[in-house]
Amino acid sequence: MMKRNILAVIVPALLVAGTANAAEIYNKDGNKVDLYGKAVGLHYFSKGNGENSYGGNGDMTYARLGFKGETQINSDLTGYGQWEYNFQGNNSEGADAQTGNKTRLAFAGLKYADVGSFDYGRNYGVVYDALGYTDMLPEFGGDTAYSDDFFVGRVGGVATYRNSNFFGLVDGLNFAVQYLGKNERDTARRSNGDGVGGSISYEYEGFGIVGAYGAADRTNLQEESSLGKGKKAEQWATGLKYDANNIYLAANYGETRNATPITNKFTNTSGFANKTQDVLLVAQYQFDFGLRPSIAYTKSKAKDVEGIGDVDLVNYFEVGATYYFNKNMSTYVDYIINQIDSDNKLGVGSDDTVAVGIVYQF
């Protein structure tokens, strides 16, 4: 019974923060470094070669490694930094050996007492403060939190100010302001102009509410894309959650303008949706003996796409479960019941996908 009760406490902490189970490798004279990571043996099952599926087909094994460090400069001022890297384990040792390997996070900053923290580097955009509420599925999910896409996912060149508990005056009231620096890359998909975003959230006794917004200039290359016009990109999202008594419920609604990447597989053209409307719902329950079932629904619809009109980008029901042997070892299955029509005008995959994984994390 003791083991069951411990799992009921540990597992939610692991879900909220990937570094909750980190191994402390140095702690001396006000300097601390924690190492964290995981190895995931993962396989997707779908029809054929997975080209018409939600997520693909075959071996998807990967590993991640990161560290978090902090140094106590004085009684009020703390310096900190974090780095995280992804290693694909489904590559050969030949020409594709480095495919998919990438830096996920790399930033450093300062925190001063109740005034807040300020950091710069590659970090999460502030709109993910809302989208993170529903990015909780065993394998899938987070479908609208694209990386290198303005403010909704991990992105480079962001300066972020965060304040917790409103200067120490209101418990649970948090806000953030973020500046996104220009990233003009070779591809329009992962570029952006200068922008500013912000988020505000409040949590009380397991309930949470959040709103986030970001707007940025688009690069010349983005404005010249075949799909999606306009000089500004906008993204906003709201979220509600309940996280208490072993129950997790969350919902997001959000919209974007000239910001969500799309590709027409039939015409081989790409760009951005003029507008999207996004709905994400998640429900999970943590049993004391380690089982965590999950059900979810996600729909992202693009509006007014050139030559097409309205079209689904993502549309599925999810059923899955994770079983935690202990704080370090787990296994899961995640099933996507795809609701995309087979005649989708962008050629978005319509087949179902099942993921089966086993995880060691520290």
From Swiss-Prot:
Per the record, membrane topology reads: Multi-pass membrane protein
Keywords, A to Z, come to: Cell outer membrane, Membrane, Signal
Q: Which PROSITE patterns match?
A: GRAM_NEG_PORIN
GO molecular-function term, one example from the UniProt record: porin activity
Spell out where the chain crosses the membrane. Answer: none
GO biological process terms on file: monoatomic ion transmembrane transport
The main location is: membrane
Classification via SUPFAM superfamilies: Porins (SSF56935)
- Compartments reported by the entry: Cell outer membrane
Highest taxon above the source species: Bacteria
Q: Which GO terms describe its cellular component?
A: cell outer membrane
Q: Which range is the signal sequence, renumbered to this chain?
A: 1-22
Free-text function comment from the UniProt entry = Forms pores that allow passive diffusion of small molecules across the outer membrane. (Microbial infection) Is the major receptor for colicin E5.
The protein's assembly and partners: Homotrimer. Forms mixed heterotrimers with OmpC; other mixed heterotrimers are also probable.
Name the chain's protein. Outer membrane porin F
Q: Name its species.
A: Escherichia coli O6:K15:H31 (strain 536 / UPEC)
